[in-house]
Curated annotation (Swiss-Prot):
InterPro entries: DEAD-box_helicase_OB_fold, DEAD/DEAH_box_helicase_dom, DSRM_DHX29, Helicase-assoc_dom, Helicase_ATP-bd, Helicase_C-like, P-loop_NTPase, RWD_dom. Its EC number is 3.6.4.13. A motif (DEAH box) lies at residues 729-732. Coiled coil: none annotated. SMART domains: DEXDc (SM00487), HA2 (SM00847), HELICc (SM00490), RWD (SM00591), UBA (SM00165). It catalyses: ATP + H2O = ADP + phosphate + H(+). ATP binds at G627, E628, T629, G630, S631, G632, K633, S634. Signal peptide: none annotated. It comes from Saccharomyces cerevisiae (strain ATCC 204508 / S288c) (Baker's yeast). Gene3D superfamilies: 1.20.120.1080, P-loop containing nucleotide triphosphate hydrolases (3.40.50.300), Ubiquitin Conjugating Enzyme (3.10.110.10). This is Putative ATP-dependent RNA helicase YLR419W. GO terms for cellular component: cytoplasm; mitochondrion.
Length: 1435
């Protein structure tokens, strides 16, 4: 029988008793209690339900029943209630939930009290109820919400209890932001699971605390010898006292800190012991510690580092070591590098979790463990001792000798006189006998022919142990100076000092080959006490000056600058050549061909202004010439100038004309057209210079070039503009290079002899340029366009009587339709409706306008073409499909036009299609770049897509918006080139006049500015911000500051004085469009990937993939690339392109192009670019002048080593790095046991550097340095931002893309693939990306998997997290990326990177091929080989 509980006794719920009859036993109950009649019982139940629900009509379940069923489903125990009577107020109950663990049989309980109850006020949501049953049901509702607030159970509750549920929901949401931890504890969907996890966490903490206490006890046991006079102290106690004393001085918190959970989930990396020793040995030889000291100029810096000193003492470094470290720029790195592992404070000790070594010392055989323990007495770690033992075939003697030699690698043994084993043993034993006789009783533990020990200081238990090595005495013996007593300890840093000075003594005395042990013992007896009393600095002055004489920077720089300037020195033409040119010109102007071309030129409107233009240019230094489209200004103005120079001045060589164009196609086209008009071959009198092609010669008078080329030329030789008329065309486009050229020209105007500036544009803000150039002279050329009739949206809607279905009117606002004359099914939208003013496109209306214009032209017997302007490729494809479906194919030839099409497809728009109306559906490419001669009508949606840069998160976003009035005018002008035209605008006249901006936003205000900053800096301009503030439109200051910070992060700008670093100077020498590409070229040469890096940069330089465009090919292209999926997007494209260039046969090449969907034009552009890059690299001296592809094997030694290629790509594109976060491991049960499951692609997360966090961090650092105000670290945003792989990537592998994301992406990029496969990125901790794209999410494109060591060696700055309390968790890259590793690994990699920078400088300033080089590059080569070995070791 169930035990009665308190609430059962107080419950007023009736019991269904069975009525009794005479002669039968009465039913159980209280004495004398009569059974209730059935009707009374039912009435009482109804009364109770009414009380609980506050209504007599409720027929659903009651809260207690719902709670009971919920607990039953979760396999919890029966719910119990703790009932309390609150005086006369009534009853309050608390539901008590419980769960019994089926394994341990332990029962866990959870009391579900009122979470809103406030002890101070004694008030809460639950008030005392009249009866116990009401109180019990109220407690059930409270418990239900607390364990199931995320469900819809409230829909099953009575109305009054539903109100309680809602009140609890409001309470939880209101307090969630302010006290998330407490709220999550109160409202827990599975409180018993949380209890178990809390127990485990508590147990783990207790275990760590016990381990910490045990470690502290161990440290206090060994007494450290600090003086030869018997000064012995407990190292643990000594450190602890210093910690307490120093803690008071440390009050500045570290800005960069991460919680324990973040460190637990961070990437782990370790160096194997051989790599660690390789790096350390190399660094000991090369580090110039003198250069790392704080100079006298920086005394103020030294004075402001008291907080840092206090922090180092708090970390328990010895005071004398801290004093020495404070002399250096990076004291912590100095200490971590120079202190032996054993003497590092406990905070930096190596834990078991800090290593990936497969061989654990504790798992070794006992004999091996004992050898390792003996070898550590030299002053090395167990790992170092084990590695030495393994490298010497487990021979203890040879391992001891090896470790001794490593202390002073420069000490050379006399290997020219090898000693036989017999001679070595004989010499060893003779010396032992002599020592025994001289120092009686001092020799002990002698093992025949192997080793022995000598007593040095009896009082301190210090002894000398020597090991015989083969070839002794011609080689060093193994030398150990130690206590050999676990109760006494000689600090390792003192051991290191003793042995270092001892070996220097042997080296200086040239004693190797003599009786070494005798000399060693004698020297130690005399000097060891002095060294123990005064060990001296960790770095003696003699060692700190080791690398000073190796530097010779100025000569190298001078030679590079000289070589780079040779190309751009201005050549003079001889008198003989001038005579030939004069004679050739005289003949040419008399030819019939020239005269016929003259007649063609005279038909252009510009011809009438020839004299005015020449006169205004002669009289003014700066001229602005505006002209309508088709006026001939681009082809004629430069010819007017040249004709005047040749005819009037007889100038055939002195004055040059440079004409810049914003696009390559324009520069080439104009050069060829002007050459034809002047009846010369392109490249002679008239030529062009674009990236990759220089089609000019010394006698060329008119040079067309892209604005970017002129910017790069001006970086190296401004004198090239002497006696030059610079014509800057299309200034209205306001590209970043055009704005920079205009600003530079203004600065150079009075500094360069004989230079004039001519600005040209179709539509431009004349007042802006007059303000920028005081005294600017202007001239306007009228065009020859025909009258154009304009129709705005209100006219179109009226003429077409356009209607929409009533159900579609929801897309428009309430007042946007004209209700007059509307029938029940259709409505008439107005031009000022929200739909149209927001820029949305009604494709039904667009198609009807095309049909309407076609019929109107047909009625006028006009066979001209129609251009439809749309914002993007997705919109063009949609419109083309609709037009093809709705129209009669016999009437229309619908042609798309955008930059992604092949040149062949683009050329289709120029053809005539007899009997059909040509309808060109285009982006703004048809606005200026391409002219369709037979166009008579334009239909303009008034929309365009432009890239906008957001410096806050360092991303660019493709934004669709209304175009400017100037662009509307340009589009309109396309309709009046051949006859009277029509211009239909799908926007209202009011929107055009009042909402559209006058001119387009300059590019300098909407793109990243790193390349601009570097270009300006390379010209010798110190204050870039001040210089650019004088531009036509100053760039946004936040974008400029972001550019400066990014260039500092990637190592091109020095953080202290904002000057170009060595690497920055090298990259600025190369006229490369992007600093990332410049870094890739330099790294490629140094690491033996020259040809492949040049090809990669050429592919990246074209800006798009080298495939035939179009959405119909997207999946085919991805399928081709997926053959190389494991290497990522860039290498997949590289392999396909490289295979093409390997083919020699032309027919096979053509087939390869077709099979792999490669664009012939883009491949040719890549080929042209590679030639240009080789020319640049030769010119600046990075490659020999006679270099041919693949001709020097060392420059291509790693061309098939994708590990090295990945690493240099990482260095080139940092900080474009994303961390790959895998989900928690899941296991699958099989017959052979549990097997780890591959993670689902949709569960993998990608994190990139948060630019908002970096900006805020800089702001806080400034505030702290200025001590202006306190900073709240809680306000710092998260260091990382989540990103997603773009579906076009070969690494994208999921079928879980939600429909909304897929729709948004398809609007920009077309349909996406939804195939699923095991993701490659699982194998790599990071991926690098070249570009990113923001739609509804941040997507990463062109991905390449990469490794942790690649990131550490080539990525951002490395710092140490010293904010922990027990142990250093690891290092932090660039303030945002925590990496778990032993601190010593961090400092070794950090110093190796410094040596790598030095190696880059040496190799580039004095290349190996330079025969006259006097600089020894062997050290640089060794550094590069070490880096290559480290990268290979991670695989």
């Amino acid at each position: 029988m169930a035990k009665k509980t308190k609430n059962n006794s107080k419950s007023s719920t009736p019991v269904n008793d069975v009525p009794t009859t005479a002669g039968k036993k009465k039913a159980k109950g209280k004495k004398g209690q009569e059974p209730e009649p059935e009707d009374d019982k039912r009435a009482k139940q109804q009364s109770n339900r009414a009380k609980v629900t506050s209504t007599a009509s409720w027929t659903g379940k009651l809260p207690h029943t719902i709670l009971h069923e919920t607990c039953q489903k979760r396999k919890w125990n029966k719910v119990e209630y703790d009932m309390k009577k609150i005086g006369d107020k009534g009853f309050i109950a608390i539901a008590v939930l419980s769960f019994t663990d089926p394994k341990t049989k332990e029962t866990l309980t959870a009391r579900m009290n009122d979470p809103t109850y406030d002890k101070a006020s004694g008030k809460g949501l639950v008030i005392p109820q009249e009866t116990p049953i009401e109180a019990r049901h109220m407690a059930s509702t409270i418990a239900l919400y607390r364990i199931a607030y995320n469900t819809n159970l409230h829909m099953m509750l009575p109305p009054n209890h539903r109100k309680t549920w809602y009140a609890l929901d409001d309470f939880r949401k209101d307090n969630l932001k302010t006290d998330e931890k407490r709220i999550n504890k109160l409202f827990d969907l599975d409180p018993f699971k949380t209890m178990v996890e809390d127990r485990k966490l508590k147990a783990q903490r207790e275990k760590e605390q016990v381990a910490q206490n045990n470690q502290a006890q161990k440290e206090q046991v060994a007494r450290t010898i600090l003086s030869s006079h018997g000064g012995i102290s407990s190292s643990g106690k000594d450190r602890q006292e210093r910690k307490v004393a120093s803690h008071k001085n440390s009050h500045n918190p570290s800005l960069v800190r991460f919680p324990k959970k973040v460190w637990e989930n961070s990437i782990f990396v370790d160096l194997d012991e051989s790599s660690r020793q390789l790096i350390e040995t190399s660094l000991k030889e090369k580090i110039d510690w003198q250069a790392k000291k704080i100079s006298h100029k920086n005394e103020t810096i030294a004075e402001n580092r008291e907080d840092l000193k206090a922090k180092l003492l708090t970390l328990q470094f010895r005071p004398k070591h801290v004093e020495e470290a404070m002399l250096y720029k990076d004291p912590l790195s100095f200490l971590l590098f120079n202190l032996p592992e054993d003497d590092l404070p406990p905070f930096f000790h190596k834990k078991k979790g800090d290593t990936k070594n497969k061989v654990e010392i504790t798992n070794l055989p006992l004999s091996t463990r004992m050898i390792v323990e003996r070898l550590t007495e030299i002053g090395v770690s167990s790992d170092e001792a084990l590695l030495a033992l393994q490298q010497n075939d487990m021979n203890e003697n040879e391992a001891a000798g090896f470790l001794t030699r490593e202390i002073l690698p420069t000490l050379n043994s006399n290997t020219n006189e090898p000693v036989s084993e017999t001679e070595s043993i004989e010499c060893w034993n003779q010396e032992l006998e002599s020592l025994e006789s001289i120092y009686e009783g001092c020799v002990m533990d002698a093992k025949e022919d192997s080793h022995y020990t000598l007593n040095l200081i009896e009082k301190l238990k210090i002894k000398l142990k020597v090991y015989r090595t083969k070839n002794y005495p011609a080689s060093l013996p193994g030398i150990v100076v130690s206590t050999f007593d676990k109760n006494y300890k000689l600090p390792d840093y003192i051991k290191k000092q003793i042995l270092t000075r001892l070996l220097h003594y042997l080296q200086e005395g040239n004693l190797i080959g003599d009786m070494l042990v005798y000399h060693i013992y004698e020297w130690l007896k005399e000097n060891i006490s002095k060294i123990i009393d005064n060990p001296g600095p960790l770095i003696p002055d003699s060692d700190s000056k080791g690398a000073i004489n190796k530097r010779n920077i100025s000569n190298g720089k001078r030679s590079i600058n000289n070589s780079s300037s040779r190309k751009f020195t201005k050549t003079t033409i001889s008198e003989d050549t001038l005579s030939v040119l004069r004679e050739e010109y005289t003949k040419r102007i008399k030819s019939s061909e020239y005269k016929s071309m003259q007649l063609v030129r005279e038909q252009l409107p510009a011809w009438k202004k020839q004299k005015v233009i020449i006169d205004i240019i002669n009289k003014n230094e700066v001229v602005l010439i505006t002209g309508e489209t088709g006026s001939g200004k681009s082809t004629q103005v430069v010819q007017f100038i040249l004709d005047f120079l040749q005819k009037e001045k007889g100038d055939f060589g002195k004055t040059k004309i440079v004409c810049t164009q914003p696009r390559r196609i324009s520069a080439i086209g104009l050069a060829e057209r002007v050459s034809d008009e002047r009846c010369v071959t392109c490249g002679e009198e008239v030529g062009y210079v674009i990236r990759g092609v220089n089609k000019t010669k010394a006698s060329t008078r008119i040079k067309f070039m892209t604005t970017g080329v002129l910017v790069r030329l001006l970086q190296n030789a401004r004198t090239m503009l002497e006696n030059t008329i610079v014509v800057i065309d299309e200034v209205h486009e306001r590209s970043i290079d055009t704005d920079l050229i205009v600003t530079l020209m203004k600065n150079l105007l009075h500094r360069v002899r004989g230079m004039k500036i001519v600005l040209m544009s179709a539509t431009v803000n004349v007042d802006l340029f007059k303000k920028f150039f005081p005294g600017l002279a202007t001239c306007h050329i009228e065009g020859r366009t025909f009258p154009i009739t304009d129709y705005f949206l209100e006219d179109i809607l009226s003429d077409l009587d356009f209607k929409i279905k009533r159900e579609k009117a929801l897309s428009y606002d309430d007042d946007s339709v004209d209700e007059r004359n509307n029938d029940d099914q259709y409505l008439k939208p107005r031009a000022d409706s929200k739909f149209f003013t927001s820029g949305q496109i009604n494709y039904d209306l667009l198609c009807q306008v095309v049909e309407y214009v076609h019929k109107r032209l047909k009625a006028a017997n006009d066979n001209g073409s129609i251009i439809v302007f749309l914002p993007g490729v997705g919109e063009i494809n949609k419109c083309c499909n609709l037009l093809a479906n709705k129209s009669n194919e016999a009437d229309f030839m619908v042609l798309p036009l955008h930059s992604a099409l092949t040149p062949e497809d683009q050329k289709r728009v120029f053809k005539k299609y007899h009997g059909k109306r040509k309808v060109v559906v285009s982006t703004n490419i048809a606005e200026t770049s391409i002219t369709i001669d037979d166009c008579v009508a334009t239909i303009d949606t008034g929309r365009a897509k432009s890239m906008f840069y957001n410096p806050k998160d360092n991303t660019t976003k493709l934004i669709e918006s209304f175009i400017s009035k100037a662009e509307v005018k340009q589009r309109r002008g396309r309709a009046g080139r051949v006859r009277e035209g029509l211009s239909y605008k799908l926007f209202s006249k009011n929107l055009y006049e009042n909402d559209m901006i006058s001119m387009p936003i300059p590019e300098i205000k909407r793109i990243p500015l790193e390349s601009l900053y570097l270009s300006v800096k390379a010209m010798g301009i110190k204050d870039v911000k001040a210089f650019l503030s004088t531009a036509l439109d100053a760039p946004p200051l936040p974008a400029l500051q972001k550019a400066e910070r990014i260039l500092t992060t990637i190592g091109l700008v020095d953080e202290s004085d904002k000057s170009l670093t060595q690497l920055g100077q090298f990259i600025s020498l190369m006229p490369v469009m992007d600093s990332k590409h410049g870094k890739l070229l330099i790294y490629g040469i140094l690491f033996g990937c020259t040809d492949i890096s040049v090809l990669l940069v050429s592919i990246l330089g074209i800006g798009v993939l080298p495939f035939i465009g179009g959405f119909e090919n997207r999946e085919k292209i991805k399928k081709l690339l997926c053959k190389y999926e494991s290497r990522g997007d860039l290498f997949a494209v590289l392999e396909i392109v490289r295979d093409y260039f390997k083919i020699k046969d032309s027919s096979i090449k053509r087939k390869y192009l077709r099979d792999n969907l490669l664009s012939y034009n883009k491949i040719n552009e890549i080929k042209s670019s590679t030639a240009q890059y080789y020319s640049i690299l030769k010119d600046v001296g990075f490659l020999p002048m006679d270099y041919k592809v693949g001709s020097i094997s060392d420059l291509n030694r790693n061309e098939r080593n994708f590990d090295i290629l990945r690493a240099i790509l990482t260095g080139a594109f940092y900080p474009h790095i994303a961390r790959v976060q895998l989900p928690d491991v899941k296991y699958l049960s099989t017959s052979s046991g549990a097997v780890e499951k591959d993670p689902e692609a949709k569960m993998i997360k990608y994190w990139i550097r948060s630019e908002e966090y970096q900006d805020k961090l800089e702001e806080y650092k400034t505030k702290i340095s200025q001590e202006t105000q306190k900073v709240d670290l809680e306000d710092l945003p998260l260091p990382a931002t989540r990103a997603f792989i773009h579906p076009s990537s070969v690494l994208f592998s999921t079928n879980s893309v939600n429909l909304e994301d897929a729709k948004l992406l398809s609007e920009v990029d077309g349909p996406i693939s939804r195939q699923s496969k095991i993701p490659t990125v699982v194998k790599y901790p990071f991926v690098l990306f070249t570009t990113s794209q923001v739609t509804n999410k941040l997507y990463l494109r062109d991905l390449t998997p990469t490794t942790t060591l690649s990131l550490l060696l080539f990525g951002g700055a490395i710092s140490y997290d010293i904010g922990g309390t027990i142990h250093s968790p690891g290092i932090v890259v660039d303030n945002w990326l925590p990496i778990r590793t032993w601190c010593k690994n961090g400092v070794l990699i950090k110093e190796l990177r410094t040596q790598l920078d030095e190696a880059i400088r040496k190799k580039l300033e004095s290349p190996d091929y330079a025969k006259k080089s006097q600089i020894d590059n062997s050290g640089a080569d060794k550094t590069l080989k070490i880096v290559e070995k480290i990268i290979a070791s991670e695989q």
